[in-house]
């Protein structure tokens, strides 16, 4: 297991070497189970030379990570973090969320859903994959942006009611989005409800709108969105939004017939037909916190959703990775 501490003077580019997007540092050599030594300039910074390593496991052999049991909770939450090239944010996210959830006694485990193909980012499909991976052990999920950190301890990450999903980052609290049907940022969903809605649409490549389509799924399933009550903080002090729009530019490009198709309710795709391959499962420590990273290769049918690859080059590049 790799022990990653927050080292501000080292720039680490997101999971590029063995993780397909995160450069990994370990301050001491690991045992014989470790593979993939990194022979690169970062190894010298780590002081470990060839001992800079990560543990890689075949998905078929992977045992489900057990949650951190911080209390008497009978429920277990899988914290699903869709991810690509956000390692600096992840180094803040993991210790912050662990301390936050520990104060609430929430049994949980963090799963980083790392998209390593060359298609455009697909947050919804990654969540579908993460749910399939974790749902045997965990009875509810948190769909959680890596750049949104809760500050108010009254935001309870509790097991959602039978009414429907619990939206932690509601429009009256989120620092940026304030429309009534907004369900993005942080949404907690029961296992049975996510299955009932057939998860999320797989058609949303690039940034935005997948949450709006998911709101329609919630409504069509006869469920309701609930939100925390009696929160005294507001849009400026409930969350820390660590997204830098200049450093982390969003992929808002629209190509082919994407704009038209992604404004419709998707009745064809979801949890039951997301196409992917988990290339590797990595168990890591970030500030002594166990984290599971799934290297996920998503598949795209360019005949049905050509906007997954506006450049026309991603399909060939992804084929090389398989």
From Swiss-Prot:
Cofactor(s), names only, from the UniProt record: Mn(2+)
Lumenal-side segments: 31-322
Keywords: Disulfide bond, Glycoprotein, Glycosyltransferase, Golgi apparatus, Manganese, Membrane, Metal-binding, Nucleotide-binding, Signal-anchor, Transferase, Transmembrane, Transmembrane helix
Residue ranges crossing the lipid bilayer per the database entry: 10-30
SUPFAM superfamilies in UniProt: Nucleotide-diphospho-sugar transferases
Annotated GO MF terms: metal ion binding; nucleotide binding; xylosylprotein 4-beta-galactosyltransferase activity
Parts of the chain on the Cytoplasmic side: 1-9
Temperature dependence of activity: Optimum temperature is 30-37 degrees Celsius.
Signal peptide start and end residues: none
Entry's EC annotation: 2.4.1.133
Disulphide linkage map: 255-310, 300-308
CDD domains recorded: b4GalT (cd00899)
Record note on disruption phenotype: RNAi-mediated knockdown is lethal. RNAi-mediated knockdown in imaginal disks causes a reduction in the wing size and a distal truncation of the legs. Also, synthesis of heparan sulfate and chondroitin sulfate is reduced in the posterior region of late third instar wing imaginal disk.
GO terms under biological process: carbohydrate metabolic process; chondroitin sulfate proteoglycan biosynthetic process; glycosaminoglycan-protein linkage region biosynthetic process; glycosylation; heparan sulfate proteoglycan biosynthetic process; N-glycan processing; proteoglycan biosynthetic process
Membership in a protein family: Belongs to the glycosyltransferase 7 family.
Protein name: Beta-1,4-galactosyltransferase 7
Organism whose genome encodes this protein: Drosophila melanogaster (Fruit fly)
Gene name of the record: beta4GalT7
């Amino acid at each position: 297991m790799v022990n990653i501490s927050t080292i501000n003077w080292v720039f680490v580019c997101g999971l590029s070497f063995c993780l397909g997007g995160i450069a990994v540092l370990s301050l001491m050599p690991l045992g014989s189970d470790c593979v993939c030594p990194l022979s690169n300039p970062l190894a010298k910074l780590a002081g470990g030379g060839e001992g800079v390593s990560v543990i890689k496991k075949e998905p078929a052999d992977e045992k489900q990570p057990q949650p951190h049991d911080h209390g008497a909770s009978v429920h277990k939450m899988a914290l699903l973090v869709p991810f690509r090239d956000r390692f600096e944010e992840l180094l803040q996210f993991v210790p912050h969320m662990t301390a936050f959830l520990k104060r609430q006694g929430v049994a949980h485990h963090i799963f980083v859903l790392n998209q390593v193909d060359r298609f455009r980012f697909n947050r919804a499909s990654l969540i579908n994959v993460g749910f399939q991976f974790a749902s045997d052990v965990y009875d509810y999920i948190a769909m959680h942006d890596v750049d949104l950190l809760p500050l108010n301890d009254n935001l309870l990450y509790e097991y959602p009611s039978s009414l429907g999903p619990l939206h932690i980052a509601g429009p009256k609290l989120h620092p940026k989005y304030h429309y009534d049907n907004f369900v993005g940022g942080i949404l907690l969903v029961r296992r049975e409800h996510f299955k009932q809605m057939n998860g999320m649409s797989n058609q949303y490549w690039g940034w935005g709108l997948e949450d709006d389509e998911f709101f329609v799924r919630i409504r069509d399933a006869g469920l309701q969105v609930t939100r925390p009550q009696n929160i005294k903080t507001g849009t400026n002090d409930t969350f820390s939004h660590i997204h830098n729009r200049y450093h982390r530019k969003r992929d808002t490009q629209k190509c082919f017939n994407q704009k038209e198709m992604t404004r419709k309710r998707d009745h064809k795709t979801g949890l039951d037909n997301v196409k992917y391959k988990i290339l590797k499962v990595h168990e890591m420590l970030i500030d002594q916190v166990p984290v599971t990273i799934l290297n996920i290769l998503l598949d795209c049918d360019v005949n049905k959703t050509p906007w997954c690859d506006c450049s026309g080059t991603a399909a060939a590049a992804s084929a090389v990775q398989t």
